[in-house]
Amino acid sequence: MATLSQKKLMESVRLMEREWVKMHKALVRSRCGEVKEVRYRYVEMIGRGSFGVVVKIMDDRHNFFALKRVYQDRRYHNRELGILMEVDHPNIVRLVSYFHTDKTSSGAYLNIITDFVGMNLEEYIKANRGVETEEIRSVYRQILEGLRYLHEKNICHRDMKPSNILIDTNGLVKICDLGSAKVIKSGERNITYICSRFYRAPENLLDYKEYDFKIDIWSVGCVIAEFRHPGPIFKGDTSGSTLNRILEIVRVTSDDLIGLGCLKPDLKQGVGIRKYLEAFFSDPDLLEVLEKSLAFSPCKRSTASELLRKQFFQQAHE
């Protein structure tokens, strides 16, 4: 059964496609609190999810932006807007302004206007199979720079995947869609059913609630592997089959599983993530970074700062 937010989302989609082809006026509030009137019109749908739609809009000066519209139920707090107002980094999408519309006793539409970047990494990878290692290095570094910034602010993205990473024609990378992002604290218990299944870290698949920022590192390792691997590396129809796929490839010890609250006596050793990826990547320094990103145990998985100090990312600066 569709939730109230999902029903409102479907109504919103129909409204956009029908009425937003003409210029609209709106009083918006910038990230610094300034209120002003803007004019914009709908250009095209960029994407839609369970709780929001993203459209390309154009203002009266012919500048393009992305507008994310979600139905904000009054009973729940929207963390994304607060996080976007706090962050400011070249590798994270920038909040331009926001406004509410159609306010009722049950809620309102929240409209978040951000930078428009023409392509996401899912599209980029499909169009650039066999891309040079130098380009992979640039993309990987920029993602990690953005994550290091978020993690230093105790913000975990919790939904890193190719479609949530944008790249422009100059190769500038921006992390987007902070709808699942949250400030997390050490030892805090959080929901584990987050992040798209193919990019979900083992601790989430095992329902280990005291996870940390390392889940983002795992997800990004999965994303980067797709530059050469034919599709998601840990593809499964269910959480269980995704976990089994991980166990087939990644070397796991009994202690790794016990540390995540799981006992699996019949554990069989995977081939090893590095050995598996050697069929697709030849650069030993890149393989080292991927191996550190895709360690099964979060205790053995590197942080963004640690990865950025690896030889693979130093080469471009030498």
Curated annotation (Swiss-Prot):
Taxonomy, superkingdom: Eukaryota
Gene Ontology cellular component annotations, sorted alphabetically: cytoplasm; nucleus
GO molecular function ontology, one term from the record: protein serine/threonine kinase activity
EC number(s) from the headed UniProt entry: 2.7.11.1
Active site per UniProt: D159
Binding site for ATP: I46, G47, R48, G49, S50, F51, G52, V53, V54, K68
InterPro entries: GSK-3 (IPR050591), Kinase-like_dom_sf (IPR011009), Prot_kinase_dom (IPR000719), Protein_kinase_ATP_BS (IPR017441), Ser/Thr_kinase_AS (IPR008271)
One Gene Ontology term from the biological process aspect of the record: cell division
Segments traversing the membrane: none
Keywords: ATP-binding, Cell cycle, Cell division, Cytoplasm, Kinase, Mitosis, Nucleotide-binding, Nucleus, Serine/threonine-protein kinase, Transferase
Catalytic activity, reaction form: L-seryl-[protein] + ATP = O-phospho-L-seryl-[protein] + ADP + H(+); L-threonyl-[protein] + ATP = O-phospho-L-threonyl-[protein] + ADP + H(+)
Stretches assigned to the Protein kinase domain: 40-313
Enzyme kind, highest EC tier: transferase
Localisation: Cytoplasm; Nucleus
Family statement: Belongs to the protein kinase superfamily. CMGC Ser/Thr protein kinase family. GSK-3 subfamily.
Function as written in the Swiss-Prot or TrEMBL entry: May play a role in the initiation and completion of mitosis.
Protein name, as recorded: Probable serine/threonine-protein kinase MRK1 homolog
Organism annotation: Encephalitozoon cuniculi (strain GB-M1) (Microsporidian parasite)
Gene: MRK1
